[in-house]
Curated annotation (Swiss-Prot):
Residues 322-332, 455-477 have a biased composition (Low complexity). This is Autophagy-related protein 13b. Belongs to the ATG13 family. Plant subfamily. It comes from Arabidopsis thaliana. It is found in: Cytoplasmic vesicle, Autophagosome.
Length: 625
């Protein structure tokens, strides 16, 4: 009695364990099918509603591992709502589990060809018989549905007696282990098969694309299964897995599927989220790129309301968009850049675009119609001279303060074209006597035009009145060009004019060698071209003046560029003023001694010019006998 009772208890425990394995096999099979046929939550169907499954896998973290995931050593992502559609706990293991994968398509209005274009087989045969049309609640739209897959999981217990008689030969523990291992292999085969069928292509397209499609996949677990007709079943293909033998029967798994060769995307519409319209290089990011032939308008064009502020564009609250002119001016660094135009460089800007402090003095000359100078398209210096004078945008004027003498400073207005000829330089000089004019002229021009090196910006022409061309400074702002309204043009200072009676012998010593640069910007060269000019300068420093200056009412002006930034090419040209100069007489012996010294200086100068500078102008002197 005891042995039979123990045998019955063992059989009951083995049967309970087998039923639990079968129950978990059904649940895991359903989970695998729903996981590969239910779109993620991020995907949307044609109605815009979100799907129910989450893409997070249950095996991603240890806290999310459920007891069911340990079965068959296969963890899947969660599909709670899909699993709720089939209450597997209330179903009997003797009932088959049927899962239909339905493709729901909503064709376009007036378009009935969606069915034919969406599903085709490899041979090109169209499937129309499997579609069912039903109307919505409003009755205005129809939905075409077609079952593209049908999975059947069932437990066949017709050979229970045979299995019981043959199973007595084996131990119960070995039978359960073999059953569990075979069920694990079958589930892994199912996991691979669901990803090889054509419906998985639709599933991936719905999940990976950011589109709202006119079709969707809907897995269903019907309580009442409608069998296929013979025609429908003939159009579908069947695949059956190898059944798993158990102590009470066997587990069977099969699938009916359609051969879908292509899923057309013609019925898809763009997704509703906002597009990035103002990406880099987009016409919407720069409104002027969209309209390259806009007429010239004063001020900045209105920006689009949805445009965002970028680091690569101009601030909408401070400046206008970049210029689209064919001849841009990259050297202007002011924050109020105007919208340039090829034919509008001479037009004045709108009064609202001009700052208050510069509205009166800056733009009338810059946009004057008489100036035919256009800025170069590159920041490099222009290779041609300015045809009509010097524009105010070329170089900043130089402030020439007077030296710290007791007399007042005298400022001489510049000439129209900055002529450096002898007549232009002598124009502001007061009328002298017949005997005094010759000495003054010789004193002014005996040093010559080459006793100091001119800056690179000064280019004397072949005519008697050379003009000066300047290179633009790429780092100069608009405000630097209009600092001093009294000096609109640069001046050129001659070294012999900045000395007086008391400071002539030591003026160059205090200032340094004549060959050293006069200012910190390095505008003047550091060395002369030959030694003859240097010897001439040293002789001029030591030579006493022909006549003594008895009046100190007027002093020459000294050019100072300490306040100017380094690297800016600025040239000063100034003429001496002799309104208060009175000349005194000297002895004849002193005059003859100076005459001999000036002859020697003349010979040195002519010799140096003939060897080093053949194009220099011959210097004449009234003392040439």
């Amino acid at each position: 009695m005891s042995s039979s009772h123990n045998r019955s208890n063992n059989n009951n425990s083995e049967g309970a364990k087998a039923e639990q394995i079968i129950f978990e096999f059904f649940a895991k099979s359903l989970h695998i099918i729903l996981e590969s046929r239910t779109p993620f939550m991020s995907s949307r169907n044609f109605s815009g509603e979100q799907m129910i499954c989450s893409p997070s896998s249950s095996s991603s973290s240890s806290s999310s591992v459920r007891p069911r995931d340990k079965w068959f050593n296969l963890a899947l992502r969660e599909c709670p709502a899909a699993l709720e559609s089939f209450d597997i706990g209330r179903r009997s293991s003797l009932e088959p589990l049927v899962v239909d994968v339905v493709l729901v398509v909503r064709p376009l209005v007036g378009d009935q060809s969606g069915k034919r274009e969406l599903i085709r087989n490899f041979s090109g045969k169209d499937y129309q018989s499997g579609w069912n049309s039903d109307q919505d609640e409003l009755g205005c739209e129809t939905k075409n549905e077609q079952i593209i897959e049908r999975w059947v999981v069932q437990y066949d217990n017709r050979k229970i007696r045979e299995s019981v008689t043959t199973s007595s030969r084996r131990s119960s523990s070995n039978k359960l282990q073999v059953m569990y291992k075979k069920a694990t292999l079958l589930l892994r085969s199912l996991f691979v098969m669901v990803r090889l069928l054509p419906a998985y292509k639709i599933f991936r397209e719905l999940n990976s694309s950011g589109q709202i499609f006119k079709f969707k996949l809907v897995p269903r677990v019907p309580s009442i299964v409608e069998p296929f007709t013979r025609k429908e079943e003939a159009e579908m293909q069947k695949f059956s897995f190898t059944p798993v033998e158990t102590i009470c029967g066997r587990l069977c798994l099969s699938v009916l599927y359609r051969s879908l060769s292509d899923v057309s995307c013609e019925h898809s519409t763009p997704m509703s989220p906002t597009f990035i319209t103002d990406y880099v290089g987009s016409p919407l990011a720069d409104p002027l790129k969209r309209f390259p032939s806009l007429p010239l308008s004063y001020g900045s064009p209105p920006l689009l309301p949805f445009q965002r502020r970028h680091s690569w564009s101009f601030d909408r609250y401070k400046a206008s968009p970049p210029s689209v002119s064919c001849s841009p001016s990259p050297t202007r660094s002011d924050s109020h850049a105007l919208v340039s135009h090829p034919c509008s460089r001479h037009l004045p800007p709108h009064p609202s675009d001009i700052p208050t402090g510069r509205r009166k003095e800056s733009y009338p000359e810059e946009y004057s119609p008489c100036q035919d100078f256009s800025p170069p398209p590159s920041p490099s210096a222009p290779k041609h001279a300015v045809p009509r004078g010097i524009t105010r945008t070329e170089s900043a004027p130089v402030r020439i303060p007077a030296p710290t003498f007791q007399s007042k400073e005298n400022v001489v207005a510049p000439s129209a074209h900055l002529k450096l000829s002898r007549h232009a330089s002598l124009k502001p000089v007061r009328n002298l006597g017949p005997g005094e004019s010759g000495a003054a002229i010789d004193k002014l021009f005996l040093y010559g035009r080459d006793d100091f090196r001119r800056p690179s910006g000064v280019r004397p022409s072949s005519s008697s009145s050379p003009r000066i061309s300047f290179s633009r400074s790429s780092s100069r702002s608009f405000q630097d060009d209009f600092d001093d309204p009294d000096f609109p043009c640069p001046f050129d200072v001659e070294y012999d004019d900045i000395t007086d009676r008391n400071s002539r012998p030591g003026s160059f010593d205090h200032r340094g060698d004549i060959h050293e640069p006069f200012d910190s910007s390095g505008s003047y060269p550091k060395k002369s071209q030959d030694a003859a000019v240097g010897a001439l300068v040293r002789m001029l420093k030591k030579a006493p003046p022909l006549r003594q200056d008895v009046s100190e009412s007027s002093r020459p002006e000294i050019c100072s560029n300490n306040n100017k930034p380094a690297g800016a090419h600025e040239i000063a040209v100034a003429s001496i003023t002799a309104s208060g100069i009175a000349l005194a007489s000297k002895t004849t012996a002193d005059a003859l001694e100076e005459l001999r010294s000036y002859k020697e200086m003349k010979n040195h100068l002519l010799l140096g010019q003939s060897t080093s500078n053949p194009s220099s102008v011959t210097i004449t002197s009234p003392f040439d006998v």
